[in-house]
């Protein structure tokens, strides 16, 4: 199976409060997977239920499943501004955060399919850009996004992140076609 087989397999829905524990589970599992591979991006237990409750109030979280009723294969957050990384900006972009897949259920290429769905959601809202960031010292993730059509547009050396910690991030964006 290739990522081109994936679109017909995945369904997408906006997350609600009944999904909070699933979002935490996905995030923690993704963090453990990263650590096992020497990737310093996330830590298990770093973001809990209260984080995702805030996202549901202030932005959007999306769930991807195999078919309409199948198991969860991944999720992502969609924000309509991102002051910590991008500062004050005109409303021309959507910001994707915490793109994560379930390594037990996600078919190959599911991450790219979910990213494309996030891009469609942003384009349908009338915004022309999809923006995201990754740790400056994570070249593997940066390459993943560049291979998906994203361009590096800057560095933010001291992003104020979750829990008040500061870290450097690479800023990437992709111009979207109208949907």
Please place each PLM-identified region on the residue numbering.
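Structural preference for long, well-ordered alpha-helical segments within the folded cores
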Residues: 22, 117, 121, 143-144
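Conserved GNAT acetyl-CoA-binding A-motif
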Residues: 115, 122-134
